[in-house]
């Protein structure tokens, strides 16, 4: 299995399985000299951890992080940083009924066909449990980006199933378990999830992520374009089936006179590009949306096959998120932060001394609509 590392200069390699003794990651390329404690990382992990409301999996994992290396006297040394998160609430017996079958919509079938062996307990390596170390690494990336460039990476849920969530204010996001930017809609979301759980079914979600303060110039054309790497990273999140940057698929119906963001001496007039042109950051907000599919582990009986190819019916009774999108916001934020820190370091390596006589215009003109 060779696809476990993300990044070029700032790299993250994850390890572990859902029901193994521990999960974690090794981060290489973190700049030295940044103050870092386990509390800095734990703050982000607590936003993602399971068991925080009745609407997510009831698996009770504290997700307590241990920093094993790369930090001395509270400061990063430039050496690899190893993060370890111990699994403490595995319940492998819940998965005995799927040891010989494949869950529809899950990686069970493809892992078996590719590797000839499969850890069926909680999905093993394919489990969303492996997003915890990604969030741990993302916490480090966020901290460095904020301290070095003033970059802020934030996200929110913009849709739960067919329910659109109008954006009201960022302050609402941290006040509810859905990461919804609209407190008034939370009771509707709760009722929706309660009904879904009673039905033994699941649903998808859309998550929006915004990075503010990114300087102009990050990105490596042609094939390591900033937006290409963002899409690559976002598709590496479990259950993500679609990525939009800026106007995304709505660009199909926009005319060039609308989609092209005009430039004025006072700044850009729009941001349909999502903060990226030609694979390089414009200095505007980088805006990303991801589509998350419904959880495949559900109680509703579904047709499948056994390992011998015989017909079977699959019902899953473990502790699962009826909507994995509810806890996906900090994961998507982390993925974006990991791409940004990697490109910040790559830009510094090649173009750190480049200067231009053209002024850097504001991300948004005062009269922009």
From Swiss-Prot:
The enzyme's main class, written as a single word, is: lyase
Positions annotated to bind FMN: 125-127, 238-239, 278, 293-297, 319
What EC number(s) would the UniProt record show? 4.2.3.5
Q: Which reaction does it catalyse?
A: 5-O-(1-carboxyvinyl)-3-phosphoshikimate = chorismate + phosphate
- Lineage, top-rank taxon, reads Bacteria
Q: Tell me, what is an example of a GO biological process annotation in this record? A: aromatic amino acid family biosynthetic process
Q: Name one GO cellular component term.
A: cytosol
**What binding details are noted for the cofactor?**
Reduced FMN (FMNH(2)).
Task: Write down the required cofactor(s).
Answer: FMNH2
Q: Keyword set for this entry?
A: Amino-acid biosynthesis, Aromatic amino acid biosynthesis, FAD, Flavoprotein, FMN, Lyase, NADP
Asked if the keyword NADP belongs to this entry, the reply reads yes
Q: Which sites bind NADP(+)? A: 48, 54
Q: Report a single Gene Ontology molecular function.
A: FMN binding
What pathway is this protein said to act in by its record?
Metabolic intermediate biosynthesis; chorismate biosynthesis; chorismate from D-erythrose 4-phosphate and phosphoenolpyruvate: step 7/7
- What InterPro entries does its record include? Chorismate_synth, Chorismate_synth_AroC_sf, Chorismate_synthase_CS
Q: Which PROSITE patterns match?
A: CHORISMATE_SYNTHASE_1, CHORISMATE_SYNTHASE_2, CHORISMATE_SYNTHASE_3
> Quaternary arrangement and interactors, per the entry?
Homotetramer.
Q: What does this protein do?
A: This reaction introduces a second double bond into the aromatic ring system.
Family according to the record = Belongs to the chorismate synthase family.
Protein name per its UniProtKB record? Chorismate synthase
Q: Which organism is it from?
A: Burkholderia mallei (strain NCTC 10229)
